[in-house]
Amino acid sequence: MSLLLWSNILILITAIVCLVVVYWYFKDSPKDIKATYLFALFLVLAIQVLIIADLAFVELIVEVLYIAILTFVYIILLQSIRHLKSEHYRYPYPFVFTPVFLLITYPFLYDINVLKEVIINLIEGGGIAVIIFLFVYHINAFKRKYLAYSGLLSFILAMILASFLSQKWIYADFLWPVFLSFGMILVTYSFTYLLRSSANK
């Protein structure tokens, strides 16, 4: 089994685990966040299936789906931040859909590879930074804080390995999918716990 195929299968299995976690543990949480989260995970599944199937035009389709995933991640974060605020301080609900502009502007960057990669890295880093802020700000709500911290650390390590070390270190391409998988599962569990605990207050 090639390294690329192994990483795709690992992320595919991870996405299925996360789907189960979100479906079962989001029962008392806001339905809009649950629906958006599930849809984003279905897109992750779709990407892995397309890569494994090695269909025609798969690169373009995967790239568009990945931008869609990043868009939905930001929508989830904005929905969650709004939900965790007291009612008097919540911004208007339509504001949570502003990340859709990522999808709208993407075609203008499609042919500019260097700029596109930089922007995608910034978007990924920004998403992780928002999750860190969200978890740190609400850290007392977590029963198992070490799971939240471990998930965040795994995400950061996966991003560093994939973005900066994949061409320089022979083990980077093996390790980043492992850290990404741990990060996805732990952050998903911690995220659902945070929203469930806030819903029960």
Name each model-derived stretch.
Residues M1-C18, P107-E124, D173-F174:
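Hydrophobic transmembrane alpha-helical segments in integral membrane proteins
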Residues N8-V22, D32-L55, E63-T71, A148-S166:
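Hydrophobic alpha-helical transmembrane segments of multi-pass membrane proteins
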Residues V17-K27, L50-F95, I132-V136, F191-L195:
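Internal transmembrane alpha-helix with an interfacial aromatic "cap," most often the third helix
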Residues K27-L41, S86-F97, A141-L152, N200-K201:
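Membrane-interfacial loop-to-transmembrane alpha-helix junctions, especially the N-terminal start
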Residues V49-V58, I104-K116, I160-Y171:
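Juxtamembrane "helix-exit" motif on the non-cytosolic side of transmembrane helices
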Residues F57-Y66, V114-E124, I170-L180:
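Non-cytosolic membrane-interface motifs at loop->transmembrane helix junctions
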Residues L77-F133:
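Membrane-proximal helix-loop-helix units in multi-pass membrane proteins
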Residues I131-K201:
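C-terminal transmembrane-bundle signature of multipass membrane proteins
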